[in-house]
Amino acid sequence: MRRVALKIAYIGSNFHGYQRQPNYRTVEGELLRVFKETNIIEDTWTAHYSVAGRTDKGVHSTGNVISFITDEDIHINQLNGLLPDDIKIIGEARVPYGFKVRFPLTRTYTYIQPISPFEKKNLDITKMHVAMESFIGKHNFRNFSKRNEKNPNRKIIDVNLEVDEDVLIFTIVGESFLWNMVRKMVTSIMEVGYGKLDINDINELLKPKELRQFIRLQPAPANGLILSDMEYKNIKFKDSEYAKNKLVEFLKKEYMLHEQEKKADCRLIKILKK
């Protein structure tokens, strides 16, 4: 018997989140189906199965990690052949028996935010960068998650913003995150950029004085969020380039379908505005 860790990539669009649920298609449900078919896991309890991140419906991943104990050899290509096109195991690592997958040194999230070409001129990127700096360090993130969090304090290591034509790419690195925290951080930064919030509002949100929330933040849409990486002490994954390429092929097909819809929408807008 040995403990293994597997890095899982998936396109969350057609999943009802990671965690298995009766009558819903989930990432975990598909993985466990294949593991049981191949006798890698008989049941999750005896295999001491666990996962680093239980992502919500619509959220994607290139770096979620699962771990379990098995006496079977792991053949990634064989397992991927049994998995649907929108999930692939892209890495494997042998880990100590006592490895705790839920406690990485850092987690990295990426958020993809399209910029409307009709509102782009109203966006102040400079103010957004200033607002992002407010999140660095350890803060009380109660206003960026559920109100009843037992321990709302979290440490953010880095927040970065890349502008790529009509898309903003946020990269947020932290030790751990609360539910909806990243998506609400993105909302607040975007609202600073559009002048709906002031930078001082961000600072006030990070210092909640009472249970009443003076600004109610809506989480940014789930389909822009990617759980992109986990870093563990002294653990190095052996990645499968073949598995990554199979997922890329699937994404290229999906991209062209959505690109056609987007171009058609833009043309409709131009026609209607004539």
From Swiss-Prot:
Asked if the Swiss-Prot or TrEMBL record annotates the protein with the keyword Isomerase, the reply is: yes
Q: Does the keyword Isomerase apply?
A: yes
Its UniProt entry gives the catalysed reaction(s) as: uridine(38/39/40) in tRNA = pseudouridine(38/39/40) in tRNA
Alphabetical UniProt keywords: Isomerase, tRNA processing
So where does substrate get bound? Y109
Pfam family of the protein (one)? PseudoU_synth_1
Q: What EC designation does it have?
A: 5.4.99.12
Family designation: Belongs to the tRNA pseudouridine synthase TruA family.
User: What function does this protein fulfil?
Assistant: Formation of pseudouridine at positions 38, 39 and 40 in the anticodon stem and loop of transfer RNAs.
- What is the official name of this protein in its record? tRNA pseudouridine synthase A
Q: What is the lineage of its organism?
A: Archaea, Methanobacteriati, Methanobacteriota, Methanomada group, Methanobacteria
| Gene of this entry | truA
